[in-house]
Amino acid sequence: MMTRDQFVRQISQEQAALRRFLTALCCGNSTTADDMAQDTLLKAYMQLSQYDERKRFASWLMKIAYHVFIDNWRKLKSHAEEPIASAKFIQDAQQTDNAFRYQALYLALESLSEKVRITILLHYMQGYQVKEIAEITDATESAVKKQLSRGREELKKRLKDE
């Protein structure tokens, strides 16, 4: 079983990737992403006894983050009229061009179905392989491949229109 010190070391290595993943899922809303990251870390620590050390720690952590996101999304969906993605973009004059590019990307990602968006983010932002994504999202490898293909096509179409 992983010790507390080992857990802290692993978390420090994966924290930036976890935050990037959740920020992308939250369409750039870093406040919501930070809250979800805290929830994820707390759940991971509470479930540490369930971690199988034969598997990658990062995959296990992302699976927890995925479930935290889904839980939060469902809560917000049932309580709010607008989706999570009231994305906040950088107002700095120097970064306006980048903000517009990110905004277009976030809006394109937001237009994807939840499953496809998560699959795209895990693969292209986090670098996970199809097999790992299938494990994280409780899907088959075939379904993950279809979601990646569908997501690429949708993103091409939406970003081309921009």
Residue spans for each PLM region:
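Short, charged helix-capping/linker segments at alpha-helix termini
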Residues: 1-9, 20-39, 49-50, 141
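Structural recognition of an alpha-helix C-terminal capping motif at a helix-to-coil junction
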Residues: 35-42, 55-67
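Sigma70-family region 2
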Residues: 39-56, 75-77
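Arg/Lys-rich amphipathic alpha helix in sigma70-family domain 2
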Residues: 50, 63-82, 98
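Acidic, proline/glycine-rich intrinsically disordered inter-domain spacer in sigma factors
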Residues: 86-110
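The N-cap/first-turn positions of alpha helices
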Residues: 115-116
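A short pre-motif secondary-structure segment
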Residues: 119-123
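DNA-recognition helix of helix-turn-helix
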Residues: 137-161
